[in-house]
């Protein structure tokens, strides 16, 4: 059991953004197909495979460039909480599953207290297939980078 637990991990980061928590959350729930417009070099597309945008149980296929290569991920929306501006995607299939038994992304966006802007909190939970697989720090950095680009895009829309 001790070996298995060393394969399980969590990474978290926070990104300060200028957009409202609601608008930023909305990009991932109602408009994920627009994310590629905000981050054209990183996210190449997002397609609804099954269900409805932003609804629990829906299946979304993301195409993105990570570590210099085009990557595909088929994700299921596991949780959505509009009050908390939270969404969780569980990876079902795709390139990440070559290195991880399980992988989930949670994004929660909270308004800053007493000032404009928000905090985008990314939480990655995963289980590696072996010790040789690196922890996904570069993927966490990818989340930071797309957050900044989406923020700029949302501000330009205003």
UniProtKB/Swiss-Prot annotation:
Xref: InterPro entries: Bet_v_I/MLP, MLP-like_ligand-binding, START-like_dom_sf
Keywords: Acetylation
Keyword Hydrolase: no
BP GO annotations: defense response
Superkingdom of this protein's organism: Eukaryota
GO cellular component: chloroplast; cytosol; mitochondrion
Chain positions found as N-acetylalanine: 2
Pfam families listed in its UniProt record: Bet_v_1
UniProt-listed PANTHER family: MLP-LIKE PROTEIN 423 (PTHR31907)
Family label: Belongs to the MLP family.
The protein, known as: MLP-like protein 43
Species assigned in the record: Arabidopsis thaliana (Mouse-ear cress)
